[in-house]
Amino acid sequence: MARARRTKRASVTDIYRGCKQAGTCPPDVINKVEQTTIADKILKYGGAGVFFGGLGISTGRGTGGATGYVPLGEGPGVRVGGAPTIVRPGVIPELIGPADVIPIDTVTPIDPAAPSIVTITDSSAVDLLPNEIETIAEVHPVPTDNLDIDTPVVTGGRDSSAVLEVADPSPPVRTRVSRTQYHNPSFQIITESTPLAGESALADHVIVFEGTGGQNIGGSRNATIETAQESFEMQSWPSRYSFEIEEGTPPRSSTPVQRAVQSLSSLRRALYNRRLTEQVAVTDPLFLSRPSQLVQFQFDNPAFEEEVTQIFERDLEAVEEPPDRQFLDVIRLGRPTVAETPQAYLRVSRLGRRATIRTRSGAQVGAQVHFYRDLSTIDSDALEMQLLGEHSGDTTIVQGPVESSFVDINIDEPGPLNIGQQESTMADDTDFNSADLLLEDAVEDFSGSQLVFGTSRRSTNSITIPRFETPRDTGFYIQDIQGYNVAYPESRDTTQVILPQPETPTVVIRFGEAGTDYYLHPSLKKKKRKRKYL
């Protein structure tokens, strides 16, 4: 008889998963899985008020935890199997030896013939500290020549109280004058062509400090000028850098770096993963304001804000072409996110999804697309830069060939009318021509000149040409390719001359390059016959 095979019973977890939804689980299965038995409740509520951690229970060591086993009614606990603790001092102890003994020299016996009175100079005292160094202080006398000694002055009479004037014993402050010059490449001195008399701002400023000494010119040093002097408290000039405030580098964003890195780490993986996300750069400006108009044709609703995720629904059978080819088959377009590129540009991004393949069950399969647009930089206004500096005179530039001369002549006066007249003995024989007034006696030489066509409205291009020492006359020609070239149409009426020619022969002979070949006219060729000889 074959033994029946024992079927394995399902575990408590498997039974709980199958019967929980139907509501047919036994109470013991629910209490086992959800930990609601009596023992579990005792551990939950009892563990909230009693802490047995650190006692080493069920560890097998038997050490009694951190404090050890404490017998009832005794002192602190002792660890089982622990080594005694040796108390060591914090300072290294020193050995105590005998006291230092100072050697005393042997007393020399006194000679009987020596005098009983010992002078101080002949003292033979024992030097107990032979290592002392003799110190000699040299005091130099203060020179008394030309010293102004301030002595107290007592003024007053018998009936008045004495007033004691004490001078300030503090010595004069020593000062030093120094001059520092900094080179600033952005500063240029403007020189004037018409200098005027007076103070110029281009000269260096000289600052005289008190306390540097000096000599009095004229008069005696002890004159009454000293009594008329009035002393002011001098203050030092501040440095040029004392008013500058050191400012650190301002932050580029208001969000802390730690929070920004944590929040943008997942977003960067979703946007810039080239294996899973397609990168598409959008150039249409509608991507910033109305991105839905790039996906499908629709009416513009000004009350709708396109700052949220947009979902586009399309018919499965309809084939629609989007306004922009880059947004083909896009069914979802996320909300805009603003980030900074490594080139310090501001980038607006949207994460979209395409529905390229659709199955019969309605499932849509497509790739994720990262649409982004980098905002261009804002160029600063082109302002005309001016030189840093000041000048007291007027800057005058005179260009003789450019300026025009105006002649104001009164034709009623007889003086100017004599220009260009021949000398006449009669005053009434005044005969002149108005063209004589325009004549000029100066003779101009235009040899070696060049004629330049241009207009004064356009700016003149200045080109610096070096000049070398050479005995020959060197001429330079600068071609102006920035002007306007005016091309006028030219028409030439030439009379065609027809020469009379005789009648041309019927035979045309064409000579080749060698002149040995010719071609006969077809009319001169013989006709072919069937019979050559008749």
Curated annotation (Swiss-Prot):
Specify the protein name. Answer: Minor capsid protein L2
Upper lineage is: Viruses, Monodnaviria, Shotokuvirae, Cossaviricota, Papovaviricetes
Q: A Gene Ontology biological process annotation?
A: symbiont entry into host cell
List, alphabetically, the Pfam families matched: Late_protein_L2 (PF00513)
GO molecular function, one example?
structural molecule activity
The family this protein is said to belong to:
Belongs to the papillomaviridae L2 protein family.
Arranged from A to Z, the UniProt key words for this protein are: Capsid protein, Cytoplasmic inwards viral transport, Disulfide bond, DNA-binding, Host endosome, Host Golgi apparatus, Host nucleus, Host-virus interaction, Late protein, Microtubular inwards viral transport, Phosphoprotein, Viral penetration into host nucleus, Virion, Virus entry into host cell
**Organism of derivation:** Human papillomavirus 37
Choose one Gene Ontology CC annotation of this protein and give it.
Answer: viral capsid
Q: Where is the short sequence motif Nuclear localization signal located?
A: 1-10, 526-533
Cysteine pairings via disulfide bonds: C19-C25
The keyword Transcription appears for this protein: no
The cellular location(s) given in this protein's UniProt record come to:
Virion; Host nucleus; Host early endosome; Host Golgi apparatus
Q: How does it assemble?
A: Interacts with major capsid protein L1. Interacts with E2; this interaction inhibits E2 transcriptional activity but not the DNA replication function E2. Interacts with host GADD45GIP1. Interacts with host HSPA8; this interaction is required for L2 nuclear translocation. Interacts with host importins KPNB2 and KPNB3. Forms a complex with importin alpha2-beta1 heterodimers via interaction with the importin alpha2 adapter. Interacts with host DYNLT1; this interaction is essential for virus intracellular transport during entry.
Q: What PTMs does it carry? A: Highly phosphorylated.
